[in-house]
Amino acid sequence: MALLHIAEPGLSAAPHQQKWAVGIDLGTTNSLVAVVRSGVAETLKDEQGRDILPSVVRYLPDGLQIGAEAKHAAAEDPLNTIQSVKRFMGKALSDITQTNLPYQFTGADKGLVHINTCQGEVNPVQVSAEILKALQLRATEALGAELDGVVITVPAYFNDAQRQATKDAARLAGMHVLRLLNEPTAAAVAYGLDSGQEGVIAVYDLGGGTFDISILRLHQGVFEVMATGGDSALGGDDFDHLLADWIAEQADLIAPFTPRVQRQLLDLACDVKQQLSSQDTVAVSFAQWSGSIDRTQFEDLITPLVKKTLMSCRRAIKDAGVEADEVLEVVMVGGSTRVPLVRQLVGDFFGRTPLTSIDPDKVVAVGAAIQADILVGNKPESEMLLLDVIPLSLGLETMGGLVEKIIPRNTTIPAARAQDFTTFKDGQTAMMIHVLQGERELVSDCRSLARFVLKGIPPLAAGAAHIRVTFQVDADGLLSVSAMEKSTGVQAAIEVKPSYGLQEEDMLRMLRESVEFAEKDIKARMLVEQKVEADRVLESLRQALSKDGDALLSPEERSVINDAIQNLVNIQQGDDTDAIKAAITALDEATSEFAARRMDSSIRQALQGHKIDEVN
């Protein structure tokens, strides 16, 4: 059966009409824009011949400066010059933990961070939009045409709020977002690893502000994401801060510093760091102090941070179920991978020389451009297979009638994704897998595709069993869903055609409704999640009371807990999410002493009949 023809709204039906779509690497420190011309992906330069646009925006009383011009003015005007804004995307004021930033932060009504400037308060979405506008202008001037769409890359560890903030920034800049693409995936595309030797590939991405590690398996031209890890607040900026602190210590400067001095220190540290990638020793001068630092001293400063990235690599490899020596290729991404120590330790960890032939600053933008060119429809008919995408998200039902999306809409096929789930009740030996299609948050608003049951789950405590559910869509659009209990290997599977019976008008209606009811759906999901959590707490507590309540509680204590239980049961019937959450907290507080006594009792029983030396 032929795949349902899917086209993005507004795209021309003409099969060979050239359309311009660009890939944008919206980075913490630097940003780039790239395009595919005549089949070759290239980054676009500004009038001065520079590929890289520093991700810096300076607010002036009568205008803006963006990029290198703004970066150069940062030391003189740190309060109005916003750098590394990507770190603040989707964050609340309470999430900002760095104390050495020169900005004046405030919290908005909804808790989102704002920054005070001479033009008033601005938020990270607005700042990012200015960077995107500059890249869009560069692209339209270089191409002599308007853009039909963009693919913007984000760290794999970005959460929903951070991803939505990125989309909001693009829309504020007047862009049509074809897709957000994980940076490691873009790098793999840039290196053409999809047509290389089958096996395991690691993508090590250390940028200015984020670190991501992705373990991929290539099989028959399909990348399966086996595991991901990383740190959304670790990158080359942290190298700069450590080096800046070292310089300040050598110069006998006492913190806290003025914003201007802080910016001067960071600029100097960044310059010294870059020089140490190619030199053994660099002369350093600041204030009244002059001295030098060698590469070994710098490496001593940053070794703990680099080793921290390797801990993430180790966890990702373990999660993927492979060994480091099984990795065929290691792709290095991000400007911070130019640091010799990073390349050395990563190479030692994986036991092979990392791939560095493509400029690590450009590789993500290049991969995004290749993906954008595919999505906008510029490939010849012989390659149209690459254009087939999943029209609506695929997922499964979780407790409370919620939908957990496994493969998002617009994912290019073939594709594979896996996610772990667990049991809800003690002794649960079977699990119903309900496969769904759609963009809404509730099962009742999505399209049911199939159901099957996984039996033979070991009767363990709630949450102890681990079931891996894998979704795979082949080149013909056939979806296979399998579920496997990890400890026993017992599994079940089903195949279904997601596009069967789906008319284009149905798909468009479902997409429109997902936008129209987005806010309502999120509120409904939050309510259901709290009700499910209440059920979980009540189920667990009732079992504990049945087993140990009479022995460990006085009648008065039991009465207090029963009142708290009844309060939660009553409030759970309503529609006030915050009230349910508060009732759960109140019940937790009412049972805290009971929980402590149960723990003490369990420890005494475990130690009963044992000697002290046996315990040691």
Swiss-Prot record:
Alphabetical list of Pfam families matching this protein: HSP70
Domain of life: Bacteria
CDD domains: ASKHA_NBD_HSP70_HscA (cd10236)
Biological role: Chaperone involved in the maturation of iron-sulfur cluster-containing proteins. Has a low intrinsic ATPase activity which is markedly stimulated by HscB.
Protein family (similarity comment): Belongs to the heat shock protein 70 family.
Record bears the keyword Nucleotide-binding: yes
Keywords for the protein's UniProt record, in alphabetical order: ATP-binding, Chaperone, Nucleotide-binding
Single GO BP term: iron-sulfur cluster assembly
GO MF terms held by the record: ATP binding; ATP hydrolysis activity; ATP-dependent protein folding chaperone; unfolded protein binding
Transmembrane segments: none
InterPro entries xrefs: ATPase_NBD, Heat_shock_70_CS, HscA_NBD, HSP70_C_sf, HSP70_peptide-bd_sf, Hsp_70_fam, ISC_FeS_clus_asmbl_HscA
Protein name (Swiss-Prot/TrEMBL): Chaperone protein HscA homolog
Species this protein is from: Tolumonas auensis (strain DSM 9187 / NBRC 110442 / TA 4)
Lineage: Bacteria, Pseudomonadati, Pseudomonadota, Gammaproteobacteria, Aeromonadales
Listed HAMAP family: HscA
